[in-house]
Every structure is written in C-alpha cells, then in structure tokens.
Amino acid sequence: LHKFTSNRRTMSEAMGPVEHLIAKGPISKYATREPAVRQGPIPELLTNYMDAQYYGEIGIGTPPQCFTVVFDTGSANLWVPSIHCKLLDIACWVHHKYNSDKSSTYVKNGTTFDIHYGSGSLSGYLSQDTVSVPCNPSSSSPGGVTVQRQTFGEAIKQPGVVFIAAKFDGILGMAYPRISVNNVLPVFDNLMRQKLVDKNVFSFFLNRDPKAQPGEELMLGGTDSKYYRGSLTYHNVTRQAYWQIHMDQLDVGSSLTVCKGGCEAIVDTGTSLMVGPVDEVRELHKAIGAVPLIQGEYMIPCEKVSSLPQVTLKLGGKDYTLSPEDYTLKVSQAGTTVCLSGFMGMDIPPPGGPLWILGDVFIGR
C-alpha cells in the first residue's frame, strides 16, 4: 500500500468545503442505506504519503491494466475511470482509464450506476472482467490473486473537483454486500466465493511513519505476524453493512467521557481522521484546548501537543489508548508547521447513524 495526502487536506488548502472532501463523502457513505487453486495469504503493499490515506495497485482485464485504488472498508463497490468518460471530466483526464477493447476477458454489462458523494454524483456503467491483486506481482509482493468475473463500475463522470487532485484512480470497497450499489458482489466476497484464499480474512497494517519501508500492507487471506505481538482481539460486528462494532465509551484523560452508555462505531480505512457527533467532538476539542479554524478543522499549538491528555477508546471492555502524538497531525505549508486535531465533528443521520468513524488515526496506532 502507498500513503498519500488526503483529498480533504489537498482540497482544504484550495478552500473547498470540508463536507465535500472528508472520507470521499461520508454523509452518503453512512447515511442510507459471496474454482481456483487455494493459496496462502496474499500481501499487497500499500504506500504511505504524508501520513494521510493509503492506496495500492490492482489490475483489471487480460492483460491487466494497472490502477491505484483506495482499499476502503467503508464502501463496497469497485470503480475506476473509463476510457469513455465525459469530455469535461477533468479528473478522468489525469488518471488511468480502463479500456475494455484491450481486454480479452471483458464481458459487457451496461447497467448504469450512481454513487453519491458530498460534492455530487459519480456515475457510469457496470462491466465485468478479471481483477488482479496486485497488478503485477514482484519480489516485494510475491504471488498475487486473480478474481474472475468481477463486476465493477466504469466511471464516466466524477463529481466536482474532489477527484482531480486525488493520487488514486479509483476505490475498491471492502464492506459488506448489503451496502453495495446495484447489489454488486464486492471483490473480497467474490474472492471468497471462488475459494482463492484459505481463510476468509483480510487485514491491514497502516504505519503512520512516512519514512518506514515497507510502509503499510493489506493481507488477503490472513494476517502478517511480523506486525503485531501477542494474540489478536476480536470484536463482534453489530450490523453487517459497514465494519460496525460497539464502542463502550471514549475518555479524554480523566476530564471528559463521550459516547456515554455506549455507541456504534465504524472501522473505516477510507477515512483519514476520527469522526464523531458534532456536539461530542466539540466537547473533546474543548478538553484538549484545540482552537477552531475554518472548514471544520481545529488547531493545537505544536509546543503543547506533548502535554495533552491521552484519548482512550473502550471497545468490548478493552482499552485502546491514543497518545497526543497519535491523534494530532503535523502539516507543513509555506515553511510553517502547524498541528491539527485528528478529530472531526459530523452528524450522520439515521438510519445509518449516529456513528463514530474510526479512521486511519485509530487504525494506524
């Protein structure tokens, strides 16, 4: 996997409204709405860019056409730009495009699809082809897996300017089929159905150290023991749509508790920050002395970060503690370094919400 500056950061610098940018449109992500030779776990290296979001490479077609995608546990569809995208779709011009004429395994579908984001609707039509992870296996990522007959979206219109600056071409959703647009079987569910891995498991290692090599990894079919000590802790999925679990509470030092009495939370690799209800996050920022900026961001004086309280999430009776360095982000611009809070307030309405979203700030710890 590779890390890149989030759309939110890139577009925020261009004064775009944050509601259009964070998590590729979480309002719509959360508001509404299963024979080849088996093999061992398949690693996919992810790249870390400026401690923000993560992408990896896949191939679509025969021979494979390579695309960079966000492996997103907060959505369930795979889409990439199409060679047939609209003339005025600038985002399409600057990214790799799928060309069905160059694939011997392409099967026409043609059903139209729409995925709604805060800045507009991404639209196109469905197609079917093989999907390879990674695109071209190498010595650093041996093996690989090819999923046959995978339905995916060819995007012919991408909304607003959000995707223009993106360092990824598309998105590969890894949530449950229940939230898949057009009821398309997600890639990993198709992979399981075709019995391409011994264990129906995938795992992420996200390293927030941008200098670390290899930086991050997605493992299909298992876990990589070199990235953890001891035994794994399991939490029940409370609703098979997103990777949704129950959070008992969230403590800010000894001065504040939010999510009192418990709440629901989503573990989402496609969101950079931790997102919670507006009123609760406002209280959290008050407790850590963060100062509001424009566009929903909060700043913390960098010299005060080390003295901030720890933030502890209690999940299934187990404490997961974030240090101040874990939940703050250093951003340098025009020679000046500022420290931003890793928390964002956003109210997610029923039936999907209210929810906390545990993004890369949490997962990367």
Curated annotation (Swiss-Prot):
The keyword RNA-binding does not apply. Residues 1-39 form a propeptide. InterPro entries: Aspartic_peptidase_A1, Aspartic_peptidase_AS, Cathepsin_D, PEPTIDASE_A1, Peptidase_aspartic_dom_sf. Its main location: other. One of its GO terms (molecular function) is aspartic-type endopeptidase activity. Keywords: Aspartyl protease, Disease variant, Disulfide bond, Glycoprotein, Hydrolase, Lysosome, Protease, Secreted, Zymogen. It catalyses: Specificity similar to, but narrower than, that of pepsin A. Does not cleave the 4-Gln-|-His-5 bond in B chain of insulin. Disulfide bonds join 66-135, 85-92, 259-263, 302-339. One of its GO terms (cellular component) is extracellular region. It is found in: Lysosome; Melanosome; Secreted, Extracellular space. Residues 54-365 form the Peptidase A1 domain. One of its GO terms (biological process) is proteolysis. N- and O-glycosylated. Its EC number is 3.4.23.5. The active site is at residues 72, 268. Acid protease active in intracellular protein breakdown. Plays a role in APP processing following cleavage and activation by ADAM30 which leads to APP degradation. Belongs to the peptidase A1 family. It is linked to Defects in CTSD are a cause of congenital ovine neuronal ceroid lipofuscinosis (CONCL). CONCL is an autosomal recessive disorder. Newborn lambs are weak, trembling, and unable to rise and support their bodies. However, they are able to vocalize, support their heads, and to suckle if bottle-fed. At autopsy, the brains of affected lambs are strikingly small. The deep layers of the cerebral cortex show pronounced neuronal loss, reactive astrocytosis, and infiltration of macrophages. There is severe degeneration of hippocampal pyramidal neurons. This is Cathepsin D.
